[in-house]
Structures are given as C-alpha cells and as structure tokens.
Amino acid sequence: MARYLGPKLKLSRREGTDLFLKSGVRAIESKCKIDNAPGVHGARKPRLSDYGLQLREKQKVRRMYGVLEKQFRNYYKESARLQGNTGENLLQLLEGRLDNVVYRMGFGATRAESRQLVSHKAVLVNGKVVNIPSFNVKASDVIAIREKAKKQSRIGAALEIAGQREVPTWVSVDATKMEGVFTRQPERSDLSAEINEQLIIELYSK
C-alpha cells in the first residue's frame, strides 16, 4: 500500500479529529469543518456499526502516526506478544518510533516532516546516524540533530512552534543544542484521551 500524498486536512476531516498532520500554527477548526467528513453536508452523520467504529479508530491512529497498514498490524502483533496491556503496549511502540520522538522533541513541525529529517540522515541516536523512521527508541537514548543539519530553517521554525506547546513529560529537550533525551516510555495517562485503543484491539482480535 502506497503512502498517502493527498490533502492532509482531508484525513483529519475523515476521522473527525485533528490528526496533527499540519504544523499547528493555526487551529485546525479555522482551516476546515472538522466535524463534517468530506462529502458529508449538514449536521446528520451516518451511524456506524461496531465494526465501522473499530475500523475508523484504527485508521485514525494509523494516520496520526503515519504508519502503513502492514506496519500497523505488525505493531499490534508485537504488542500482543509483550507482557502487560496490549493496547498500552501498542501506543508505546508507536510513541517509541524515531520519527515520532523527533516530532515530540519539536525538531519537526509534523510527524511527516520528522520522518523526512530521519530519512535524510539529519538525526543522530546516541551519536550515530540513524535513517530508519521506525527505529525503536529506548529509554535514556539521546536524540540530536546533526551539526550540518542544524542550520536548516525548517528545524528552527519547528522549534518555535514547539515552544508554543507543552513538552511531553517523557522527553527532555535542549532546544539550543538541538538534542534531547527519551527519558522513559510514556504511560497511558500521558497520551491522548481521544484514542480508544481497545477498539483497535477488538478489530484485530477477530
């Protein structure tokens, strides 16, 4: 399955929530009618079946993290093998992706931009170049921008945007040095309450 290259706001409208696919300079509500899916007019929304709700939740989270279907299913399988709550394991695996950690630290304005920084070898993990967006970051790993990439205007712009929002408690960032530490795995209470991971588990458990 190819990666989606169409309008980002259309995906957020489809899922009925902000997927944080844009930089966040303006509230998404000011850019489009987030409550109305593309092609749906008026206040009435079609009623979804249980399967429909499960599918929509899976699509929402998959698109939020920018993960393809096969990758997402593999994350579910791995989360089911791990000890503990499968849903929480799934979210922790997604949060531990290098492209997501780069985004959480504010080096990329979006996850897509952060993924591009990783792919273009602009990111160091513990002093070594890693260009695999899905690389699994561990607690205490140091993430930094390469010296020759620090002058990129988009990174400076992303840090300015990040300065307007609260830094997640599971990362520490030195914006001046353009480096940070993934201090710990996020707990479920740290993450968005708008995600209902149980619906995803029910979908894949069938």
Swiss-Prot record:
Keywords: Ribonucleoprotein, Ribosomal protein, RNA-binding, rRNA-binding
Gene Ontology CC annotations of this record: small ribosomal subunit
InterPro entries: Ribosomal_uS4, Ribosomal_uS4_bac-type, Ribosomal_uS4_CS, Ribosomal_uS4_N, S4_RNA-bd, S4_RNA-bd_sf
Cited SUPFAM superfamilies: Alpha-L RNA-binding motif
GO biological process: ribosomal small subunit biogenesis; translation
Source taxon at top rank: Bacteria
S4 RNA-binding domain segment(s): 96-156
Pfam families: Ribosomal_S4 (PF00163), S4 (PF01479)
A GO molecular function held by the record: structural constituent of ribosome
Family from the record: Belongs to the universal ribosomal protein uS4 family.
Summary of subunit composition and partner proteins: Part of the 30S ribosomal subunit. Contacts protein S5. The interaction surface between S4 and S5 is involved in control of translational fidelity.
Function as written in the Swiss-Prot or TrEMBL entry: One of the primary rRNA binding proteins, it binds directly to 16S rRNA where it nucleates assembly of the body of the 30S subunit. With S5 and S12 plays an important role in translational accuracy.
UniProt cross-references to PANTHER family, sorted A to Z: 30S 40S RIBOSOMAL PROTEIN, SMALL RIBOSOMAL SUBUNIT PROTEIN US4M
Protein name: Small ribosomal subunit protein uS4A
Native source organism of the sequence: Psychromonas ingrahamii (strain DSM 17664 / CCUG 51855 / 37)
Gene: rpsD1
